[in-house]
Amino acid sequence: MSASDLTSVQAAAPQGSRQILVTSALPYANGQIHIGHLVEYIQTDIWVRALRMHGHEVYYIGADDTHGTPIMLRAEKEGLTPKQLIDRVWTEHKRDFDSFGVSFDNFYSTDSDENRVLSEKIYLALQEAGLIAEREIEQAYDPVKEMFLPDRFIKGECPKCHAKDQYGDNCEVCGSTYLPTELLNPYSVVSGATPVRKTSKHYFFRLSDPRCESFLREWVSGLAQPEATNKMREWLGDAGEAKLADWDISRDAPYFGFEIPGAPGKYFYVWLDAPVGYYASFKNLCERNGIDFDAWIRPGSKAEQYHFIGKDILYFHTLFWPAMLEFSGHRTPTNVFAHGFLTVDGAKMSKSRGTFITAQSYIDTGLNPEWLRYYFAAKLNATMEDIDLNLDDFQARVNSDLVGKYVNIASRAAGFLIKRFDGRVQDSAMNHPLVAKLRDAIPQIAASYEAREYGRALRHTMELADEVNAYVDGAKPWDLAKDPANAVALHETCSVSLEAFRLLSLALKPVMPRVAAAVEAFFGIAPLAWADAAKPLSSAQPIKAYQHLMTRVDAKQIEALLAANRDSLQADAAGAAAGGANAAKDAKSNAKANAKPAVVNGADDAPISIDDFAKIDLRIAKIVACQAVEGSDKLLQLTLDVGEEKTRNVFSGIKSAYQPEQLVGKLTVMVANLAPRKMKFGLSEGMVLAASATDEKAEPGLYILEPHSGAKPGMRVK
């Protein structure tokens, strides 16, 4: 290697070691890790590994989010204490993260002494600052279970479209939002009883305080993602608008969580102590390893603090969390990085299609975790864009990039080097122009990782792999090996190929750490860091016998994975049926004991006559345009051709299942004679029909009805 080569590589390395604390959002301890979760943990882990390869002091912290009503109720249903449930789920989550190479320095639990102490300390500091308010509020109360009910634990009939079994805050059929008090025939999803209204004292974090607003307006300017900045400014509004609302941080007993100091029977809402769990997990690590915790979290700390999250929880991490930290005497996050959602084959993950894929089913089916790490990395960038796991593309990309391009290089050269040259490279070959080009590219690839542009880093890497393969194809070592007179040329070809392979492995190490470890063992070298681009292979260290590093993805493995997850749906359904029967018995006996009958779903679904059905005008409609509704998380605006002179405008609550571009040009079925309804987004002139499971938690998914292609807009369905 020339002196100039060495200088260029070293100049790209960061000057001085940084202290960096990194977190991913905490998984809720109420279910399994699935591939949608893994997008975030893999994204964070790649970033952390890339920074560690610079020699920085980096700590990647995680924990299970363990508090709240859902965990309390699930534990009761399973005959466990909440502690027993969260301990079991922690073991399952830790197993899954280990399987996918997620390299937490500490994976802990929010149900810890450290978290209790820190949550109380932050709360008391906010109280001292005059940022905690007490107010009486009215809530729904379950008289059978003797507990207050969150909105999502109340169901009933939508007051607008009269769809049954809708949640207490919004209708998933027509997209309306409303108060739980407006629901018709409401019932508790916990017991089936009719809720009553009760008042209770609650505690609020005064986010509307001018101090909070002023701080957040300044803090938002430092966010790395323009989408996040724009969203925060939308929430903040213009100066003087006072759009920020105070945040209810308390819940009433019974509740699984931490009791609020000086407020018996009142508990911290899970979203207060969950982010504090980042610090609690780090404090636990610090105490075990002699790290100065306070030096990392005090105001003005030189340490950096980053949070990777899904875009759905941006509100908590860019409003409440930084404000809580600022006014409780802590440093604030350096930045928050939000990612998009995962779809599978262009649609929301579905248990019925087998695409609601759990981490454990992926491992049990025998698929390589580093295949998925590579595929996700190839799709990820620094924006909040959603990413799609296309299973055909997954198979093709892994087989082409990783097997056909990358590991193929080593397999083509290693045998010749061991057999003909005792496994020792030709030192002069380390200055070959191709090797120099790869070496010069390493700083650019490392910079792409730090910028969270993983797709760019991998495209660059695979372009270089193409050049290496073209070099091997041109040199034809298999032909050179036939004539002893070509020994020098053969030695050079194999040496260049293997040094290039080492550099490609360095470039891929943040994404595929296990393959990188196998490559390090193959070459007999220390763990690779970015600075090692300048340390080529040497004839002083012979390589070891080549072992296969990766196999191809087989279509049968994909089929088995989908089948395994469809089977799990059937098992869940059987369990839900049994559980539902038991719950019905319990609700009946509880209701009897309280002299109040429980509501039974569907009891009023009396048969209708053919005349009743004839009143509904169902028409074929063509979706000629579709767009997301700004300000709504659920609605799409459809422009429909119904065979009339003018198109119709319809709002539909199917945003969770479809991207707008997926629907344009499709035929569907609409209720054409439904009275137009004025919504805050505009006038809705009908309703499109969509199917969903009765229990959408057990089987999520919405599916619009699509007639055969021979149908035409305006045709009547009868």
Curated annotation (Swiss-Prot):
Its cofactor is Zn(2+). SUPFAM superfamilies: Anticodon-binding domain of a subclass of class I aminoacyl-tRNA synthetases, Methionyl-tRNA synthetase (MetRS), Zn-domain, Nucleic acid-binding proteins, Nucleotidylyl transferase. A motif ('HIGH' region) lies at residues 27-37. A motif ('KMSKS' region) lies at residues 348-352. This is Methionine--tRNA ligase. NCBIfam families: metG, metG_C_term, PRK00133.1. GO terms for cellular component: cytosol. The keyword Repeat does not apply. HAMAP family: Met_tRNA_synth_type1 (MF_00098). Zn(2+) binds at residues 158, 161, 171, 174. Coiled coil: none annotated. Is required not only for elongation of protein synthesis but also for the initiation of all mRNA translation through initiator tRNA(fMet) aminoacylation. Keywords: Aminoacyl-tRNA synthetase, ATP-binding, Cytoplasm, Ligase, Metal-binding, Nucleotide-binding, Protein biosynthesis, RNA-binding, tRNA-binding, Zinc. GO terms for molecular function: ATP binding; metal ion binding; methionine-tRNA ligase activity; tRNA binding. It catalyses: tRNA(Met) + L-methionine + ATP = L-methionyl-tRNA(Met) + AMP + diphosphate. Residues 612-718 form the tRNA-binding domain. It is an enzyme of class 6 (ligase). The gene is metG. It is found in: Cytoplasm. Its EC number is 6.1.1.10. InterPro entries: aa-tRNA-synth_I_CS, Anticodon_Met, Met-tRNA-synth_bsu_C, Met-tRNA_ligase_1, Met-tRNA_synth, Methionyl/Leucyl_tRNA_Synth, MetRS_core, MetRS_Zn. ATP binds at residue 351. Pfam families: tRNA-synt_1g, tRNA_bind. Belongs to the class-I aminoacyl-tRNA synthetase family. MetG type 1 subfamily. Its main location: cytoplasm. Homodimer. Binds 1 zinc ion per subunit.
